[in-house]
Amino acid sequence: MPSIKVDGLDDVFARLKAIGGDIESVQKRAVYAGMGVIRDEVVKQIEQLPVQKGYLKSKDLPRDVITPREKEQLIMHICIASMDSKNGTVSTAISFDGYTDIKSKKYPNGLPAVLVARSINSGSSVRTKHPFMRQAQAAAKARAIEAAEKAAREALAEMMEG
């Protein structure tokens, strides 16, 4: 799973500690802002995946495309996972939540969205690899760090005012 580490906010956290502010809430706000930028880039990468309508027969394997329905379902189920805080570090991930409306023999209630995303991102025996998550992370890394730093500084300013 791609990860981004934001350094350079030591001054913000030192000032927060000095005024007795809640450092973890500021960290979570910053992480959420940065992950929002990455989530938007993941959606953009999914929208750029090659699409082919209709059922693909076994002679078309491995697939180098996704169906419009798979694309729609991925975009619908993308989310920012709940945050985890350990030893002063806050982390989260971009994930795909729930089940799609794409039914199969093994999944009569719908395929897990994360399974569809993983098969497209990593490839499989019947699908060519399209690493959209890694491409999104690489494309949005600088903007995500910028957004996280901005959110942390805004939170500090609000705490100092109030």
Task: Indicate where each model-derived feature is located.
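Short, Lys/Arg-rich flexible segments
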Residues: M1-T92, N109, A113-G162
